[in-house]
Every structure is written in structure tokens, then in C-alpha cells.
Swiss-Prot record:
Protein name in UniProt: Putative manganese efflux pump MntP
Transmembrane segments: 6-26, 37-57, 71-91, 101-121, 131-151, 162-182
Highest classification ranks of the organism: Bacteria, Bacillati, Bacillota, Bacilli, Bacillales
Recorded GO MF terms: manganese ion transmembrane transporter activity
Membrane topology: Multi-pass membrane protein
Keywords per UniProt: Cell membrane, Ion transport, Manganese, Membrane, Transmembrane, Transmembrane helix, Transport
Amino acid sequence: MTFEQLIPLIIMAFALGMDAFSVSLGMGMMALKIRQILYIGVTIGIFHIIMPFIGMVLGRFLSEQYGDIAHFAGAILLIGLGFYIVYSSILENEETRTAPIGISLFVFAFGVSIDSFSVGLSLGIYGAQTVITILLFGFISMLLAWTGLFIGRHAKGMLGTYGEIVGGIILVGFGLYLLFPI
């Protein structure tokens, strides 16, 4: 693979990773420990490897009609997660709130990586080099998720008790933006 072929993939990886960054800003406003932040970033990175890989494999066999469905599902997942965070911030006390672990972490990672599935479909149709592509997507998304989580964690300290509500609203807003781009 030449440098000229690598540049578009890096740009595409940053574009896909910006979803993870933006959403991680909101998620970072939860009371997360450093270890949880690292685990969340790695999980997002892994999903940004798995989803485009599946998309690339299926892209060799399927048409691009599933791109809109993946985009819609990702937006709905983000909106639902955002509403859940706002709900839990308002109705539950600090001690009962939990960080995204288990199923909720997988839903979160799936939601921010589902766009990479549709990109993988397209790249699979065009025969992109699978290993380099998915490793770039995963690594850059992981770094951007960590950046968003750390910035969100710092912003929570400045926003006080309203930090999680703001984070949930960011998730809802980002999901709505995916549904209705400006």
C-alpha cells in the first residue's frame, strides 16, 4: 500500500472516530475512573475493528442499501443512551449510578461504531485492504474516544452536578444530528 493510498484511509478513520470522540465527551461526564476510561476506549476501538470487518466481508456480497439502515440504527441507539443518562442523572442518586459496563458498554460501543459497518460495506465492494483499514479504524477511534472521555471528565468538574445531564443531552443531540443532518 502506497502513502497516497494510506492518506484517504487515515482521513476516513478520523471521520469515523469523530463519532466516538463526540459521544465520549458526553460519556466522560459520568463519574468514571481512569481504568474504566481506558477499558471504554479499548472496547470502542475493538468495535471499530469488528464492525468494518463485518461490513467489508458482507460488502463483497451485499449492495449498499444497508448503509441507511445502519446509520438510522446508530442514531436511535445514541438517542436512547442519551435519554437513559439524563433519566438516571435526574432520578437516581450519585451512589446508584453506574459506569457503562457489560451490556451498556457494548451498546454504547456498537452505537458509535455502526457507521463504520456501512463504510466497511462500501470499502468491501471496492476491494480495500482489509487488515490495514480495520486496524487504522480501531486505533484512531480508540485514541479519539480516550481524548473525548478525558476532556468530558475534566469538563464534569467544571459543570458540577449538571455534568451528566449535559453529557446525556450531547448524546441525544448527536443522535438527532445523525438522523437529521444540517
